[in-house]
UniProtKB/Swiss-Prot annotation:
GO CC term (a single one): extracellular region
Annotated family: Belongs to the GDT family.
UniProt organism field: Dictyostelium discoideum (Social amoeba)
Protein name as catalogued: Growth-differentiation transition protein 7
GO annotation terms (biological process): regulation of developmental process
Gene giving rise to this polypeptide: gdt7
Amino acid sequence: MIKTILIKLILLVIFCYHFLFAEEDVISTPPGYYDLIRHKRDPPITEYQSSQDTDLYYPDVCRNALRPLDYPWINEFAPIFFPGFNMGGFNSIFIPKNRSMIFRTPFQDSLVTLHVVCIEGTFIVEGNRFLFANTIIVLPGGRFESTTGIEFYDENDSGVSFYPDLPKDPSGFFPGILVLGGSISVVGKEPIVYRASRINDSSIEISPPVPEIIISPNPWDRVYKLVKIFTELYPLGFYCRYNTDEVGKILSLSSYLLYPFPPVSENDKIIRVLVETDRQQTVIPTNIYKREYATKGSIYITGGSNAYFKNIFFKNLGFTKNEPYNDTKLIFSPNDTNVVTDIIMGTNQKFRSSLYIESSKNVTIEGCAFVENDLTRSPLVFFDSNVKISNSLISSKSGSNIIALHGTDSIQSSNNSYLLEKIDLASWDVERNNNIDCGNQGNGIFSISPNINSNGDYFSGQQTAFNYYFIPNNSVNSNQDNSSLNSRPIEIIIKDSMFNPTASNGSLNKYFLNINTDGNKTISTYFTVRDLKTSHAINMNLNNSAIAFYNLKGGEGFKMEGNVERLDIIGSIINSNGSIKNISTSTTNIIDSYIYSSSSDIQPFNNQIYGSLITPYYYSDSNTLDKFEIKSILPNAPIQIVSGSLFNVSVQIQTLSSSVSIDNISCIFTSSVINTTVVQVNSNYSCILPLNITNEEGPLNLRVTLVNNTSPSSVSSDNYLYIIDFPEITVFNTYEFYSGWLMDNSNSSQQISFGGNSFKNGCNKVDSNCTISQNSKYSTVFSQLSITLPSNFKTKTHWMK
């Protein structure tokens, strides 16, 4: 009895397993198409795409694939190990789970043609020829490794004979690679991307030295040594022949067949060299490419996969045009969700880029090249993924070099070259919602959400190098119902990266950095930009958000445009006139920062709410920055003070060289309520001015000008070292406000008065913040100031800290 029950339970479990995980996932389609497999996306995708079908559908090409003999000792590919293998035809093979197999590419010369490779176990490709296939699918848990190139083909390619009459792929994934969870690693053994400098019109010096390419001894198979040169004028590159010196460091260039050979220009700021190996050469190929240009291929990675690409040229891939999307539509039966009754083939599939990566947090791209010669959207698209990309070349004809969509928390980009041939102005006329969230308008890196760390990258030809665009409603194309703007702080680190917006893209405004929330007022975000160095404009449209720049280096031509709720500039140097006059803010904080001004006639910032801290250190000569720096100023925050008080105002400087003397440095103090006062810098490198507050209420706009006074009898600010506007000092005569004082005697009155002024004990607590009035934050600067109160104030007090 118990045995019978157990058998029934086991059969029930088996039935449920097959019902839930096998049959239900197979979607039947109309005649002429592959059936489809429904692949459940990870939860993060459904989080961003909540209202529409979030499942992924791919053709059921693995069902009838040949499986190897069930012998564990078989670990190398041979046709005899796959029953039914057709030596003269197109074969699909399946590597089962817990099986590992090595495929050596000389089999390509032995009438072995692979059509589909399905990998649930491990499939390793070695050799010195291309892996020749139409489709590679890495199933969940599978592992694909290759140390040679991959050549995709389809029925449209010449030389592909007796192609079988196969069903159509409605999803548009193939020819190409589809990784559904597992790992993929494709690694070339030699570097293919090199930096170069010009020697003369036909010679360049590259780094590191290029290895000699072996030339076939067979004259019928002889291939010229070719390289492809990329510059600002030729962002898509041009082919030429080359010869090297003994160490492979100096390349002498010459024309190749009908390809023109333009001389290397003296004006080229960037020269990149791509060493491409093809299938006729006897060296190991380093391309992943579609064989001919009639149709393209793509690589689509999802499902939490691990991806590693090194020294690989992605060629003739990517077919998502820089036009409005037109995806394939599946018409499901109203009675059965596993039956598709009709398929409307799309003309512009989303995310069929050279490389599209989704829901994968461990992606590394190193020393690779991506070149898309057609008007495509982008070679690289990332969704909900973390990516490291370095020492690579990304060249596009249009669109953006990289598109980073929702959930991409981190992009680490270092020493890459991002080249764009032109901004496709035609795409600007297309309805905005069909394009703007997908980077159609000429960007280096177009980002919806990630933190970006860029170090030593070079951008050329774009309208905007870094473009953050947050859209309140972007469900039109990416199926995301909610705003792409999140409330988490976003950090952008841009260090030693350069931007060259070439003149070929017309008179459009060009920005090194653009951050735009598109009027989104529902969520506030705090942006941090670190180490940015540029001589180009940046633009911000952050109506309800704040942005802070740390260690900003703004060269000549730098400026800020747009509007932002709060702007912080901290520890920065801006070497351009009027660089921040065109930015509209509610609150501005400029702290420990130096701003160039050719004239000493500097207008202070106006229309700032109390709480803004604007203390730029203006300078007129960049040499001053190498000699002196401002160590501290007091007061260093806005203060409110009682008329009749006396306190010291100070500036402390620091020399940056032992040869610099402070003997002739003077400080000229001016304000609306005191006479001009000259104070010599003392032995402590400080200027101290005792300031007696008059009875006149209102703002006391205090300025100090540091001058190199070589003639003490004639002090002038014409050739100033630094000009500093102190934070706002507000003088009150008769006013009732919270004092910020606490009484030593707890029994003392809660309100004190002197000279007609009334003060309430303590401070006003608003949202855990201590304020001395309804619109001004309590400032700890008082504890740093030496203040003498009016003589009629007798009560013993101490400052709150």
